[in-house]
Amino acid sequence: MKSQWHGTCDLRLFKSSSSNNKDIVKTIHQAKSTAPLKVMRVFNDKKDGRCEIPILHSAGGIVGGDQLTINVNAEEDSIAICSSVAAQKVYGSRGRSKLNPQGSWANQKCFFQIKQNSDFEWMPQELIVYQGGLFEQNMTVNLDPSSSFLCVDLVRLGRTAAEEQLGSGVWRSSLEIFRDNNQGKHYEFSDRLELSGEALKSIHGLEQKPVFGSLTWITPKKIMQKDLSDLLVECRQQRAGLEGFMTCSLLENGISARYTGSSTQSARFWFYRIWSLTRVLRKLSMPEYMRIWPMQENPSRDIKCPL
């Protein structure tokens, strides 16, 4: 008997045609979802009119064979941030046996269409892959040259508090960002990772650290390289006081940051600082901590986070 989930979530974001405050154009949404994915109450009361979208995985965890698909169409001039309601769990793969040693994979596919002058931020909470869990995510982004896209990935491999490691589990990730130019669609950024086996132990991999995180920001084309170079220096300075190994580098039109260590909190704090700096660079309002995130460690108020 099969019991896999095949959940979908379709989101359309667009600016409102009317507003009580003519100085603020709010982003509103249309949503359709199937279990186990569910769009919770959406807020668009931010100072800049940004839409805040929480997505819930109502089953409480992912198992082998689950297939999740998220489609986002951000229309012209829309601005939004999307996150998961809670940390997500990937349980050990079902169906492992001598006849089927590979087990069953869980998969999540995300397709983002970001149109002209839009700003979309994809910032799910951490993913916890249990021992033996098999999880693959594929993210494809079509980004207009005038638009901005920021995404964060944060994964814990094994239940560290229970002294559990990933074991025979695997975490895979593929991020492909495309942009249009005079010659048609081209790769803006491509990033593929697999964390398993020797990569968990090697000094060129995680070096026995259980937490991995990445932040990618692809800027509007109008952002100057000089501004990005200055941003890179500031991002590196913001590592002060945090635990773990953090690197940050320039892309052709953006930045890429990596975290490896033992603390998801340190990773969140550093990514929050970088996120804040990207807003400052574009002269936008400072990030507001989402209602669904852990309030006991709000980095906008924590003494360890100066921003």
Swiss-Prot record:
Compartments, record wording: Cytoplasm
- Keywords on record: Chaperone, Cytoplasm, Nickel insertion
InterPro entries (alphabetical): UreD (IPR002669)
- The organism's superkingdom is given as Bacteria
Molecular functions per Gene Ontology: nickel cation binding
Is the keyword Chaperone assigned to this protein?
yes
Q: Which GO terms describe its cellular component?
A: cytoplasm
Transmembrane stretches in the record are none
Family of the protein in this entry: Belongs to the UreD family.
PANTHER family for the chain: UREASE ACCESSORY PROTEIN D (PTHR33643:SF1)
Q: How does it assemble?
A: UreD, UreF and UreG form a complex that acts as a GTP-hydrolysis-dependent molecular chaperone, activating the urease apoprotein by helping to assemble the nickel containing metallocenter of UreC. The UreE protein probably delivers the nickel.
- Function noted in UniProt: Required for maturation of urease via the functional incorporation of the urease nickel metallocenter.
What is the official name of this protein in its record?
Answer: Urease accessory protein UreD
Q: Which organism is it from?
A: Prochlorococcus marinus (strain NATL2A)
Traced from the root, the source organism's taxonomic lineage reads:
Bacteria, Bacillati, Cyanobacteriota, Cyanophyceae, Synechococcales
Gene that specifies this protein: ureD
